[in-house]
Amino acid sequence: MERYFGTYQTFRTVSKKDAAVLMGSNTLVGDRNRINLTMDEGVHRAWLINKFNETIGYFDDGFSRELSLFAAEGLELVGILSFVAFTETPEPGEYWGQAAVIGYSPHYAEEFNRFIDGVCGLIGKGIRPKLALNGPAVDEIINSNGTWLPSEREPLPEKQRGMALLKTRRGFIDGLVEAGRTGNKGCYILSWAFLLALVAAIIIGLKSCGVF
């Protein structure tokens, strides 16, 4: 059995309507997500599922099949949201993104879960560590009890015409949302207060401009 597998992989949304989940506060950059493997009429499909059991998107057939093979070997699979993008063409446009996909042997679950937590933290800050690691690097993860992290970086894909990067890191509000998730009610209330104040400021600004 392989001990480790890691890469960045593009995923797509089923429709623009389904992209609401991807753009919402339930899906943050750096979130650790579940990968659900299905088979439909002989075609492998790997779905990215967020912490709230909502579907974020899906991987292409070839990569889905590769993940199915890793799962058959016994590897645990996770997907970490790296960025969200929108492309204008083909019309009416498409929401998509990339996830850091990691597979690991459950024999080293403690070490790799700690490693994944570290990767999530970096990605949440907009830092994309290299994940295609060789044997010695995998040994570093295990021997350090998961505290070792790659120093090499993976650049964002080059922007094309008509392409916009919508989420690449966590912002201030995202930090408050995450604190609210973990039970910090004060941060949760503060996040809503901030949003309401922002909306109020926009309305006041529009009124002062004579919009309504």
Which role does the model predict for each range below?
Residues 1-212:
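Conserved active-site motif detector
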